[in-house]
C-alpha cells in the first residue's frame, strides 16, 4: 500500500483495551497504529478500512479523518466546516445526517452547541446551493459526521459504522447487567484462550463471553449481515466492499471441532436468555448451557479456562448476599479446577477477596462506567 493511498483513521475502543485494540488493528492490516485514550489512531487503505468494519471485534466505532483546520471559536468552526469537503458531492439535501462532537476549543466547551454550529454551516451551504436542506436523523442517518476539538484544532471525520459496532445483532435477550460484546471479545483475547481447550463460564448470565469466544474461534466476522454508514459515502467502492465481504465469509471455520464451551446459570430465566442469544448467533451446537449452581456440576475434562463476570453488588445490601457466591466460587475452583486458568471480571475488590485466592495479573478495564479489573488466577 503506497503512502499516498493511505487514509487516516481512529478506532474508538473500550477503556483498558487500547493495547489489545492496536494489536487487532495491526493484524488486520492497519499501519502506524498508535494507542490513544479509549482509542487508537492508524493508517489504512480503503480495502483495509472496509476489512476493519467487517472483522474487527473490539472497536465501538471507526472514524475516517477527512479534514482538519485551526479552530479558535464559533466563526472558525463555521467557516472551516463549509470548506472542509466538497459538500455538493458528500451531502445532498435528500440525505439525512447527524453530528457528534467530542473535546473542546476556545468558546466551544459544550458538545451540543458545537454540533449545532456544524449543522448550521452545512444546512446554510445547502440552501445557498440548492435552496433546500437535509434533515437531521439521530437514529439512522445517511451520513454520520464526527468532530473532535482539541484545543485550537478541529478534526472532521466520517463515521462508517452505522451504529455502534459492539451491537452484533444476535443479542435478542439482555441480562440484568449486560456486558457489551466488544468488551467481552477483548476480555477473551486478553485471556489467551485460543479454542484448543475447554472454556467454562460458571456464572454465564446471558452468555456473551461464551458467544464472543465461539465467534472468535470460528473466525466468524462480526460485521457480516449488518448495514454500515460507509455504504452511503460518495466514494464508496461497491466491488472492493464485496471482495472484503467474500474474504470475511471465506475465513469462517465451518467444520471446526471445538472443545466443550459450557455455561452454568442459576437463574432459569437468565439461562433461557442465554439460550436465545446462542440460537440467534447460530451456536446451539457449539455452546451448552446448564441450569443450576456451578456447585451442582462438574467441569469437563481439562485443563481449560474459566471466565466469569459475577455480580459486583452495586445495590445497597447486595454485598452480603454475594459474599456466599464468591466464597462458593473460590471453593469450587480450588476443588475442581486444578491446572486450569481462571479469569474473573471484578468490580468490587471486597467481594473478590472472598475467593481466598491471589491474582497473578490485574488488568484495568471499565464496564458500564464501573472501574473493574480483569483478574487472572493460575489454579494449582
Identify the residue ranges that each predicted region occupies:
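C-terminal edge-of-domain segments
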Residues: 145-158, 375
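C-terminal catalytic and target-recognition region of SAM-dependent MTase-like enzymes
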Residues: 292-380
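Non-catalytic nucleic-acid substrate-recognition regions in nucleic-acid-modifying enzymes
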Residues: 2-141
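Short beta-strand/turn micro-motifs composed of small residues
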Residues: 13, 265, 346
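Conserved S-adenosyl-L-methionine
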Residues: 179-298, 315, 319-321
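A short, flexible beta-alpha/helix-coil linker loop
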Residues: 104-107, 164, 311-315
Amino acid at each position: 500500500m503506497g503512502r499516498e493511498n493511505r487514509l487516516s483513521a481512529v478506532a474508538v475502543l473500550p477503556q483498558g483495551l487500547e493495547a489489545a485494540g492496536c494489536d487487532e488493528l495491526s493484524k488486520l492490516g492497519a499501519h502506524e497504529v498508535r494507542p490513544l485514550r479509549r482509542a487508537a489512531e492508524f493508517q489504512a487503505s480503503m480495502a483495509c478500512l472496509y476489512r476493519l468494519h467487517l472483522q474487527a471485534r473490539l472497536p465501538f466505532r471507526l472514524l475516517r479523518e477527512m479534514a482538519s483546520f485551526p479552530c479558535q471559536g464559533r466563526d472558525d468552526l463555521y467557516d472551516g466546516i463549509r470548506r472542509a469537503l466538497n459538500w455538493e458531492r458528500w451531502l445532498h439535501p435528500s440525505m439525512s445526517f447527524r453530528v457528534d462532537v467530542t473535546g473542546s476549543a476556545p468558546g466551544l466547551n459544550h458538545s451540543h452547541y458545537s454540533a449545532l454550529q456544524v449543522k448550521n454551516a452545512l444546512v446554510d451551504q445547502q440552501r445557498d446551493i440548492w435552496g433546500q436542506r437535509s434533515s437531521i436523523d439521530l437514529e439512522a442517518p445517511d451520513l454520520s459526521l464526527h468532530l473532535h476539538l482539541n484545543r485550537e484544532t478541529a478534526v472532521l471525520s466520517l463515521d462508517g459504522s452505522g451504529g455502534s459496532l459492539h451491537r452484533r445483532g444476535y443479542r435478542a435477550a439482555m441480562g440484568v447487567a449486560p456486558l457489551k460484546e466488544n468488551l467481552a471479545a477483548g476480555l477473551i483475547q486478553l485471556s489467551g484462550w485460543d479454542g484448543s481447550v475447554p472454556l467454562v463460564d460458571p456464572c454465564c448470565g446471558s452468555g456473551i463471553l461464551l458467544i464472543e469466544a465461539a465467534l472468535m474461534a470460528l473466525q466468524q466476522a462480526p460485521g457480516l449481515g449488518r448495514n454500515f454508514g460507509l455504504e452511503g459515502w460518495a466514494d464508496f467502492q461497491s466491488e472492493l466492499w464485496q471482495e472484503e465481504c467474500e474474504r470475511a465469509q471465506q475465513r469462517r471455520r465451518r467444520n471446526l471441532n471445538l472443545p466443550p464451551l459450557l455455561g452454568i446459570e442459576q437463574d432459569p430465566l437468565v439461562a433461557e436468555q442465554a439460550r436465545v442469544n446462542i440460537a440467534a448467533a447460530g451456536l446451539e451446537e457449539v455452546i451448552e448451557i446448564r441450569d443450576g449452581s456451578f456447585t451442582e456440576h462438574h467441569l469437563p475434562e481439562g485443563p481449560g479456562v474459566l471466565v466469569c463476570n459475577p455480580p459486583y453488588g452495586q445495590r445497597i445490601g447486595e454485598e452480603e448476599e454475594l459474599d456466599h457466591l464468591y466464597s462458593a466460587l473460590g471453593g469450587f475452583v480450588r476443588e475442581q479446577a486444578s491446572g486450569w486458568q481462571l479469569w474473573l471480571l471484578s468490580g468490587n475488590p471486597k467481594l473478590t477477596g472472598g475467593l481466598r485466592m491471589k491474582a497473578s495479573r490485574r488488568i484495568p478495564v471499565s464496564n458500564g462506567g464501573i472501574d473493574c479489573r480483569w483478574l487472572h488466577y493460575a489454579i494449582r
